[in-house]
A protein has these predicted regions:
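Divalent metal-dependent catalytic cores for phosphoryl transfer on phosphate-bearing substrates
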Residues: 1, 20-133
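Short, Lys/Arg-rich amphipathic segments at extreme N-termini
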Residues: 1-19
Length: 133
């Protein structure tokens, strides 16, 4: 389901998440699992992501409906639960909210949110595009 770049990014996020979890006292195992799986549906066709969300009963607000780049967090948490059998709410919520954040985020949610933007691959990619930024 993941291309080479996405897999490498996810491995880096998992490593960063584990380090952050250790530093801040979050569950390192959960952080590593959520980190490796956070983008599981990112490369899935948008129509398929939307169908997964709709089939699960999630009702998208107007902003979410018109922001398909946000869908992979929601669809990813559903796929992880339904296809991989992971039912840990901390892990599922960390995946679901890793792009948007939310009020009252748990420590694990904050760890994954932060790790996604501070992982080595992400920083290197931004550095390679710094003229565009």
């Amino acid at each position: 389901r993941m291309g080479d770049y996405r897999f490498s990014h996810s491995v880096n996020v998992a490593k960063e998440a584990k380090k952050l979890a250790k530093h801040y006292g979050a569950d390192e195992n959960k952080a590593e699992i959520a980190g490796i799986l956070h983008d599981i549906t990112k490369e899935m066709p948008k129509e398929q992501q939307l169908q997964i969300i709709i089939d699960s009963g999630i009702i998208l607000d107007n902003v979410q409906l018109h922001a398909p780049k946000l869908w992979h967090g929601m669809s990813g948490s559903i796929v992880v639960r339904d296809e991989l059998g992971i039912d840990d709410e901390d892990i599922l919520n960390a995946i679901r909210y890793h792009t948007t954040g939310r009020a009252g985020m748990s420590l694990l949610e904050k760890v994954i949110f932060t790790a996604d933007f501070t992982s080595e691959a992400y920083i290197q990619r931004c550095g390679n595009n710094e003229k565009e930024i």
